Amino acid sequence: MFKKIKLDYKTLAPVIDDKNLDLHYNKHYQKYIDNLNSLVGDYNQSVVNIIKNIESFDKNKRSSIIVNAGGVYNHEMYFRSMNNKPYTNNKLVDDIVKQYGSYDNFKNIFIENANKMVGSGYTFLVLKDGKFDIVNLPNQDNPYSYNMIPLIALDLWEHAYYLTYYNDRAQYINNFFSIINFDYANMIYEKNK
């Protein structure tokens, strides 16, 4: 059975307030976990394995399974993509700078891409064929479904920011950069580069 990852609300303040996090974490994220558990029961594999092996599930359940598995994984990736520790250089950041020319250029491209997202979904920094890419995926689509490895996730569903930012999604996107967890992203990068 899948369970929620731990989340310390203090690590995301003041960028996202407690009321917003409580709704997001305890209602939206929890609903995806509950739905996935009811669909796959005691399936003894990771959410990533469910996504990668969706063809092994009952054809009539696949659509619901992939939406809820994506919902669980994307939320976990999003929550793990943030903390309030100061930004530090690491191999991931060094390689981002090599590919994008500067950290500021990467940041600007990521923000520009996120601001172009229409409707609900996520902006991801992914690793694809050994290179970085910044992609927008709708709803609960997941990079693993497209043979990409997610490194950073920004949730652009309104429930992720609305209670804190109301309709100022651009400010939410900009503020996200003050709490990106590059240490977590680097750990994934080092395992998959």
Where are these regions (language model features)?
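Feature for soluble, non-membrane regions of globular proteins
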Residues: 1-193
